[in-house]
A protein has these predicted regions:
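Membrane-helix interface segments
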Residues: 38, 74-76, 120-121, 151-156, ...
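N-terminal, membrane-interfacial amphipathic/helix-forming hydrophobic leader that caps
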Residues: 1-75, 87, 204-250
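Membrane-interface helix/loop boundary segments of multi-pass membrane proteins
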Residues: 134-160, 187-194
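Residue-level signature of the transmembrane alpha-helical core
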Residues: 79, 83, 124-129, 133, ...
Length: 250
């Protein structure tokens, strides 16, 4: 086995252990309590797991927290462009799905369970901050970063990391949207050599779910779709042409 692949697998297993261990303990302890206390225990155990994950992977430099190939004078604009890309891709996907009449919402007990898990302080922190950071550590920092260090072709590596990312986010339309998101953020990671744009985009994307633009007219969604596509294209073009000193990456 290639040393790079072996290291990637080991880091992924470490990440998976941290991702699962404390929430499993929290779920077991929570069985001795009634709702909503059991959900609070689970949410705080998830948060602690993410915090430990972040400390270990960034502290040990298993995943590098830097701006990579982004020129120093372009760091602030890169942050702004990351937010722009996050907002534009979110509105593009939502408006396209609305025009196609595709519902991403879970139903019944599963919907209620997920709503409870993202409510309260711990739930909001998990959904909007710590889960995005933890997922970027894994899917871009570990998997994509590891594959790019091997003989794997760039787009194959991006597609593999996006596929694994999507598999963690359900099936059907949720899988497709997560796959597209993973390809976009994976390309940015390859282009910049940095996990930071992906973290910013992921945090912004998850935070935007609090904005409700459902039950609008098709004209509204069409306008949002067109504007979003233009802004998204500009953001991608900016990272391709403006943010990087190509002589530093060659």
């Amino acid at each position: 086995m290639d040393d790079g692949i072996g290291k990637t697998i080991k880091l992924f297993l470490l990440w998976l252990g941290l991702f699962l261990a404390l929430p499993i303990i929290g779920a077991i302890v929570g069985r001795f309590f009634t709702s909503p206390a059991n959900y609070e225990i689970l949410k705080w155990s998830q948060l602690l797991g993410y915090v430990l994950m972040i400390i270990i992977f960034f502290g040990k430099r298993f995943v590098e927290l830097s701006f990579g190939h982004i020129e120093r004078r372009m760091v602030r604009p890169a942050v702004g462009m990351s937010v722009l890309i996050a907002a534009s891709q979110a509105f593009v996907l939502f408006s396209a799905l609305s025009l196609l009449d595709v519902d991403l919402q879970f139903q019944g007990e599963e919907l209620e369970r997920r709503q409870r898990l993202v409510s309260g302080i711990a739930g909001i922190l998990n959904a909007c901050i710590f889960a995005p950071i933890g997922e970027e550590i894994c899917f871009r920092g570990i998997i994509l970063g590891g594959l790019l260090k091997t003989r794997c072709r760039t787009w194959i590596a991006i597609l593999i990391s996006a596929l694994v990312f999507a598999s963690f986010h359900g099936f059907g339309a949720n899988f497709v949207t997560a796959m597209l998101f993973g390809i976009l953020v994976g390309w940015l990671y390859w282009r910049t050599g940095s996990i930071i744009p992906g973290i910013i985009i992921h945090i912004t994307n998850n935070s935007l779910t609090a904005i409700d633009i459902s039950n609008q007219t098709n004209i509204f969604y069409l306008i949002i779709l067109v504007v979003g596509l233009v802004l998204l294209a500009y953001g991608v073009w900016w990272f391709w042409k403006k943010a990087i000193n190509d002589s530093a990456t060659s």
